[in-house]
Amino acid sequence: MGKCRGLRTARKLRDHRREQKWHDKQYKKAHLGTALKANPFGGASHAKGIVLEKVGVEAKQPNSAIRKCVRVQLIKNGKKITAFVPNDGCLNFIEENDEVLVAGFGRKGHAVGDIPGVRFKVVKVANVSLLALYKGKKERPRS
């Protein structure tokens, strides 16, 4: 049996569409509000946090590496997240209790590549771009 056609079927068509919307994954995620609640950033693109510790995360098979990450406690809500530190040797610019700016890591809230469970990356350390520190354009401010 197909959809209703003809006169006086608008209400039924509208109601059916309204019900069926909720079976669409993207629509449900956008409109339920639970994804926003679960998101540590609370809908924002970036968030500041304090570095708790440096951690090494083992890469998934078939790769073999220890990816350099940091545990960060967000200032806005106190949630703890793991953030990836990009580029070679950039972990040396970060110390415990530093203030870092953290951004998403691509893939809309999913882990990227071979790094399991890491959904964020470090962008700035002590209000200085990590890329500028890496390239030697800027130095870490003395604290």
UniProtKB/Swiss-Prot annotation:
Compositional bias of kind Basic residues: 1-15
GO biological process: cytoplasmic translation
Keywords, ordered alphabetically: Cytoplasm, Endoplasmic reticulum, Ribonucleoprotein, Ribosomal protein
Superkingdom: Eukaryota
Predominant cellular place of this UniProt entry's protein: cytoplasm
PROSITE patterns: RIBOSOMAL_S12
Molecular function GO terms recorded: structural constituent of ribosome
One of the Pfam families matching this protein, by short name: Ribosom_S12_S23
Compositional bias ranges of the Basic and acidic residues kind: 16-27
CDD domains, A to Z: Ribosomal_S23
Region entry Disordered, spans: 1-27
Protein family according to the UniProt entry: Belongs to the universal ribosomal protein uS12 family.
Subunit structure: Component of the 40S small ribosomal subunit.
Name the record gives this protein: Small ribosomal subunit protein uS12
Organismal lineage: Eukaryota, Metazoa, Chordata, Craniata, Vertebrata
Gene it is expressed from: rps23
